[in-house]
Amino acid sequence: MKKLKYFTKRKTEFNGFLKNQDKLGESGKKIIIAAATAIFTISLTFSLAPRKTYVNPGISPSASYVVAHAGGALEVNGKSLNYLNSVEGFQKYYADGTRMFEYDLVFSKEGKLVATHKFEYFDGYSMKNPIPYETYTQTKIAGKFEGMTEDKLFEVIEENPDCKFIIDTKEKNETNVYERIVELAKEKEVDISKSILPFVTSKEMLENINKMYDFEEIMLTNYKKNYTTRELLHIIDSCDKIKYLHIFPVDFINIDINEINKKGIRVFAHMDKRNKARTALDYGCTGIFSDDISENEFKEKHYDFMVSKLETVKEIPLPRKQEKHSIEVELSF
């Protein structure tokens, strides 16, 4: 839809350009518009088709392929609820092999970090009217679940050194959120270099993150700036800590994923719907952000297809599933 809106806007601008050309007759305008539309249609048709195979960016047997979006969806009364950012989401998906988790952190009224996307489960609160920390901790998300707070996040980090946490935020100054995380890490004397995977939205943010802390890896995301392939490659070349690129489905035709793969960068696509996950793999991605697909489910149902889309597939053995008994989980829905 975003792609179609983009081309609609471009066509509107093109028509405006033609109206200002006094020397061009009405019939001439129609001919040029028809030709431009035909070229657009042909280019869009071809750009939508995925390649037969893509360069293997260098996935390994121990790699993770799923990021639990907002901590992962949970079921309540037979309905799957997303954007929970809950502790129980971490527990459930960890138990099913997932080792990469994305949480949305914002500041409470007192300046502490709490997890929420857009206050979906906290009536009366917003970015302009932050929730008090005590109110957040005393509120059960969807009436059942514990929200992730800054203190709980550090508990989870210390107890699960095999996990990576990707921190997104709707705060206008994203760097402030990471400054708070680094401040907490120093106070608690916790090494977050491997546990926190910065979710970088721009070149400016990348510079700030690199000055702030020596993170081992960084994930670049294209969902705010909509960079071109050339711009993305320039940013990637400027920082060897960038190991991942996060995109939305619109980027399947906006950027050349194969060129990103050639740099050894793994592309993770944001695929909310379970039945759409394979589309990302068809376009050369080697990871997904998902509300409800676990790591073990991915490896069971989608891994072989992903491998079939990558060159030198014989060098990529099927990874073993994570053991489900790694953590005990008690959930009541």
Indicate where each model-derived feature is located:
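Phosphate-group recognition and catalysis centered on beta-loop-alpha active-site segments
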Residues: 3-6, 10-333
